[in-house]
Amino acid sequence: MNYHQYYPVDIVNGPGTRCTLFVSGCVHECPGCYNKSTWRVNSGQPFTKAMEDQIINDLNDTRIKRQGISLSGGDPLHPQNVPDILKLVQRIRAECPGKDIWVWTGYKLDELNAAQMQVVDLINVLVDGKFVQDLKDPSLIWRGSSNQVVHHLR
């Protein structure tokens, strides 16, 4: 898996202070997407064990209390990303108790395959659905267009 950007302290992409990871790779290619540079799976830089360790360390850093992590992109549930995202989410669950995990995907919840559902079964919130420019609404919280749904899973 590749990623484009990692923010160790973020107050924009989810509730509270959190970490945010923007991964590479998206098959949806939504017109009007604000993150077109993340569409190609080989763009950005490789997601390494060192980066994974950094995220775990940041989530557990007591100097800056973080509520959790936001995983966006690109699409964290892109088939090529799922193995690494699953491993990361499993580590967060095991090593960062009490941290919430939010995932944004262009897929709809009812379209997800078994591998993608392994990730979803471990997260707190899934924001699903493609961005639809004609349904864009800047007043919406945590989503860009009114067709997208915020699923509070746990």
From Swiss-Prot:
Binds 1 [4Fe-4S] cluster. The cluster is coordinated with 3 cysteines and an exchangeable S-adenosyl-L-methionine. The keyword Metal-binding applies. Induction: Induced 2-fold by hydroxyurea. Changing residue 96 to A: No change in activity. Does not affect iron and sulfide content. [4Fe-4S] cluster binds at residues 26, 30, 33. InterPro entries: Aldolase_TIM (IPR013785), NrdG (IPR012837), Organic_radical-activating (IPR034457), Radical_activat_CS (IPR001989), rSAM (IPR007197). It catalyses: glycyl-[protein] + reduced [flavodoxin] + S-adenosyl-L-methionine = glycin-2-yl radical-[protein] + semiquinone [flavodoxin] + 5'-deoxyadenosine + L-methionine + H(+). S-adenosyl-L-methionine binds at residues 32-34, 74. It comes from the Bacteria. Its main location: cytoplasm. Changing residue 19 to A: No change in activity. Does not affect iron and sulfide content. Its EC number is 1.97.1.-. GO terms for cellular component: anaerobic ribonucleoside-triphosphate reductase complex. One of its GO terms (molecular function) is metal ion binding. The keyword Metal-binding applies. PANTHER family: ANAEROBIC RIBONUCLEOSIDE-TRIPHOSPHATE REDUCTASE-ACTIVATING PROTEIN, PYRUVATE FORMATE-LYASE-ACTIVATING ENZYME. Monomer or homodimer. Forms a tetramer composed of two NrdD and two NrdG subunits. Belongs to the organic radical-activating enzymes family. This is Anaerobic ribonucleoside-triphosphate reductase-activating protein. The gene is nrdG.
